[in-house]
Amino acid sequence: MFNRRAVIKTAALGAVSIFALMSANASQAADKELKIGFVGVTSGPAASWGTSNVRSMQVRADWLNEFGGVKIGDDTYKIKIVTFDDQKDPKRAIAGMEKMAQEGVHYVVGPNVDDGAAAVRPVAESKGIIYFPYSFPKELYTPPASNAVLGMIANYQSGPAIYKYLKENKGVKRVAFVAANESDPLSQRDSGIEAAKALGLEVISTSDAYQNDTRDFTPVLTPIVMQKPDLLVLSGVAPGNAPLLIRAARELGYEGFISTETAQDAKVLEEGAGELANGFISVGGASTPEIASDTMKEFVDRYTKAYGEYNDESNTKVYALDYIIETMKVNPAAIDNVEEFKKTMDTFSAPNPFVKGDDAKLTYVGTTSFGQKRQIGIPMVVTEYKDGKFETLFVAQVD
C-alpha cells in the first residue's frame, strides 16, 4: 500500500542529508588554511625588527580573515601566521626554518639579520621554501641563489642616497663609521665606506667597532668625536643600541649629523636618548602621509588598536604578506610549488593597496643590484627623527 507519510519522511531525511553534505562541503571550503611563516628576532636589542614583522603580518592576516579570507584560484583561504623567535642566533634560525618545513609552510618572512638569512638558505632550498629576509648580502639574491627575496631597501641602495643628499644639501665632507663587531653591521660598514668614497667624501674612521652587548659607548666614540667628522654613520645599528650611541656622541660634544641605513623605532629613541636623538637620520617605513592610501591609514589604526603603539618600520613590514598572497593569486599553482612562484615574479604586477593612485603597483625589483628580480618594490623613505616621531627627509625608488 502506498504510504504517503513514509515518502514524506524519506524525502525530509534526504533533504536534511543533502543540506548537511552541502554544509560540510561549505565548512570544508571555508576551513582551508594558508600558513605563512615568520623566522626572525623578537627578543634582545634587535627585537623591534622582528616584532614589527610579526605584528604587521598578524594585523594584516586578521584583517583579511575578517572579510572571509583570500580567494586564490577556485578556493578561499584563511591566513594563519606561524612564528619562531630565532633570538638572532643562526642555529635557532635553522631550527625555525626546519619547523616551517615540517608544518608544510612554503613561504616565510625573515630572518632579520645576515647570519640567520645565510644560515637558513640550505634548508629553504632543499625543502622548497621561499623566504623574505631583511638582510643585505648580495649572494642571497644573485644567481645561482633564487629562493630569497629581499624584503626592504638595502644599505647599499639607501646609503649612497643618504650620503649624496647630505653632501649636496648639508655640506657634509668628512665621514666616520662605527659598527658592532658582527658580520651584519661590519658588512654594512664596508658597503657604506665604499659608497662614501665613490661620492668623493673623506672617510676618517674605517675600523672602529664595539661588542653588541656594550652599554657605555663613551670609550668607543671618544677618538671618533675628536676627529670632528661631519657625519657619523652607525652601520647596521640595532634599535636598542642606537639611542645609547647617540646619547654618548652628543654628551661628548659631537654636533654633526648621525645616520644609519637600518630601520629604527621612534619610541626606543625617545626613551633612550630623548631630545639628543633629534636630527638622527635613518631609513623609515615605506610610507609617508603624502603617499599613504586609505588602506595604509586603516592598517596603522588597526595596528595601534591591537598593540597600543605603532612602529614606523611596519610601513615596510606590512608589504611582505601582500606580495606573497598577490603573487599566488596570479598563479595559484604557487601555493605549494615555489618554482611556480619564481616563474611569476618577473612579470608580476598588482595594485599597491598601501600607496595612493591607480598607477601604484606591487612589482618585484632588484635587477640592477642582483641581476634578477629578488626584491619587493617599495618606496625608499629616508626619515629624520624629531621630538618623538620620524619626519620624511626624502623619498626615492630602486629598480
Residue ranges and their predicted role:
Residues 2-10, 14, 29-399:
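Extracytosolic ligand-binding ectodomains
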Residues 12-22:
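Bacterial N-terminal signal peptides
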Residues 22-29:
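Sec/Tat signal peptide C-region and signal peptidase I cleavage site
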